[in-house]
């Protein structure tokens, strides 16, 4: 379904206290940093921020309209979240915003699988992105990756094997909701739909090494 863009969305999100700026980010220097790439409407991000007050959660989205939807969801909560920000940018620009070895964890939930060969480098688990994430993560930092797409999952496994000098797979799960890890799983909007359709969710937990 094509996204219906909101007029002046970028202006509106810039007026929100939840929208990323260097000044706002600087106030959280004592909190450990967690990123979610492709945070959508913010359902997963909100759940994680609720559970982990000692961390700063930053949701990343390219499209201002989607960032605005996430901000609106946060604004409608009946409680305050003081450890969450939204950033409107492309994932390949992350090193413009965050220093090397400053991120504790990166969540990649149901990214676009970019099935065509000519778009392989756009996949968030391509070698170039893995190297970017490795640079941003602290020592022993983690990536948590979830997908419903079998081909993307297999591609990611292959890419990680080819980059085993910088990352190792800690957990490999082929049916998350019927695994021992299901109880601690925060569910995204997409994930809820897949669960209703009984589509298995695949997950990898990946650790930075060296």
Swiss-Prot record:
GO biological process: RNA (guanine-N7)-methylation; tRNA methylation
One Gene Ontology MF term: tRNA (guanine(46)-N7)-methyltransferase activity
GO cellular component: tRNA methyltransferase complex
Sites where the protein binds S-adenosyl-L-methionine: 36, 61, 90, 112
UniProt name for this protein: tRNA (guanine-N(7)-)-methyltransferase
EC number assigned by the record: 2.1.1.33
Job description of the protein: Catalyzes the formation of N(7)-methylguanine at position 46 (m7G46) in tRNA.
């Amino acid at each position: 379904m094509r996204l219906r863009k909101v007029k002046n969305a970028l202006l509106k999100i810039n007026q929100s206290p939840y929208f990323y700026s260097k000044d706002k980010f600087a106030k959280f220097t004592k909190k450990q940093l967690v990123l979610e790439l492709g945070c959508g409407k913010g359902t997963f991000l909100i759940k994680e921020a609720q559970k982990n007050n000692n961390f700063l959660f930053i949701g990343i989205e390219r499209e201002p309209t989607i960032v605005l939807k996430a901000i609106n969801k946060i604004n409608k909560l009946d409680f305050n979240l003081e450890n969450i920000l939204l950033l409107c940018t492309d994932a390949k620009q992350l090193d413009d915003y965050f220093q090397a070895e400053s991120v504790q964890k990166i969540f990649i939930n149901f990214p676009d699988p970019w099935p065509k060969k000519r778009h392989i480098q756009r996949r968030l688990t391509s070698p170039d992105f893995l190297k970017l994430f490795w640079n941003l993560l602290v020592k022993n930092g983690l990536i948590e990756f979830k997908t419903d797409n079998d081909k993307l999952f297999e591609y990611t496994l292959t890419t990680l094997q080819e980059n085993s000098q910088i990352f190792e797979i800690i957990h490999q799960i082929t049916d998350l909701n019927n695994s021992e890890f299901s109880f601690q799983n925060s569910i995204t909007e997409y994930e809820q739909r897949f669960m209703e359709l009984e589509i298995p969710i695949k997950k990898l937990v990946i650790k930075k090494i060296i």
